[in-house]
Regions:
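Alpha-helical membrane-interface segments at transmembrane helix boundaries
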Residues: 62-70, 74, 97, 104-107, ...
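Transmembrane alpha-helices
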Residues: 188-221, 250, 254, 266
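C-terminal transmembrane helix and the adjacent membrane-cytosol boundary/short C-terminal tail
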Residues: 171, 249-281
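Periplasmic/extracellular loop-to-transmembrane helix junction in inner-membrane transport proteins
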Residues: 4-77
Length: 281
């Protein structure tokens, strides 16, 4: 006969599919009390309520989230600095678009995680600190958390949504406005700064929003790469290896909350600055 207590202590022996849970309510009730499978809500709540407490000797939850945010923002900033200018140029200059669109289009379908083997071969566990040749100091140890391989995965994930939206935003600008401004003597700089960028801004901002969301989703995978010893993604991975499911769930909730807050910030900017776009369609 099937021993409930024995199975509860050996959760790997069965598969907890929705169908199994519905067809075995008695066994499910026993397993709910197993903190390795489903930790009590109060344990998860305690971790979230005290983000400054040390967690399984891996630093605080808030500290790891902060490190992850810095990594995401660094990789994301690099994607913005390349994606927006290149996208605007490709949208405005048809020749450049024809030249680069096919080339970039070959890389767009590649998932960010597919780059991992190449990234590790290229960069190994090098960080910004080692790449800059900094001496051992407080700045060195801070920048040593920013592994180039992690930043690249985040960068490549955010780049294409930003680039595509910038191209689309410029291509949909009314060309009559551009031609009229050129006839009236406007310089290329004036056309870019006073016509193209303001008109394309809603599409660009939407691309920035999508890109940040993708960058945040790439975070956990990036922090699983060799060389990572901090960050909420690494915290989740380490917590799993030591059987701390409560920390895993708390980390997942933290990622969800921070990602939602970042998305809400961009939505607020879109509503605040570009509400007119809704009525111009």
């Amino acid at each position: 006969s099937w021993n409930l207590e024995e199975q509860a202590q050996n959760p790997d022996s069965i598969c907890y599919s929705p169908g199994y849970i519905l067809s075995h309510p008695a066994q499910t009730l026993v397993l709910v009390g197993n903190s390795l499978i489903l930790p009590p809500l109060e344990e998860i709540g305690a971790l979230l309520a005290h983000p400054l407490d040390n967690v399984i000797a891996m630093g605080t939850l808030a500290g790891n989230i902060g490190i992850s945010l810095v990594r995401v923002l660094c990789g994301y900033a690099a994607a913005v600095l390349l994606g927006v200018p290149l996208g605007v140029a490709m949208g405005y200059y048809a020749g450049l678009h024809r030249l680069l669109n096919l080339f970039l289009g070959m890389f767009r379908p590649i998932p960010p995680l597919a780059w991992v083997p190449l990234v590790l071969a290229w960069f190994g566990v090098s960080s910004l600190a080692t790449a800059m040749g900094l001496p051992r100091s407080e700045l060195y140890y801070y920048l040593n958390n920013l592994k180039i391989s992690m930043l690249f995965i985040i960068f490549i994930g955010a780049l294409f949504p930003i680039l595509t939206s910038a191209v689309h935003g410029v291509q949909t600008v009314n060309r009559t406005l551009v031609d009229s401004a050129r006839v009236l003597g406007a310089s290329e700089r004036d056309i870019f700064t006073k016509i193209l960028l303001p008109a394309a801004a809603p599409s660009i901002v939407n691309g920035l929003r999508i890109g940040l969301g993708v960058a945040w989703m790439c975070l956990v995978s990036a922090e699983m790469l060799p060389g990572s010893l901090s960050g909420v993604g690494y915290l989740i991975t380490h917590a799993y290896t030591v059987g701390r499911t409560d920390v895993v769930i708390a980390g997942m909730i933290s990622i969800s909350v921070v990602g939602a807050l970042l998305d809400m910030a961009f939505q607020w900017i879109e509503r605040r600055k570009y509400a007119w776009k809704q009525f111009s369609r």
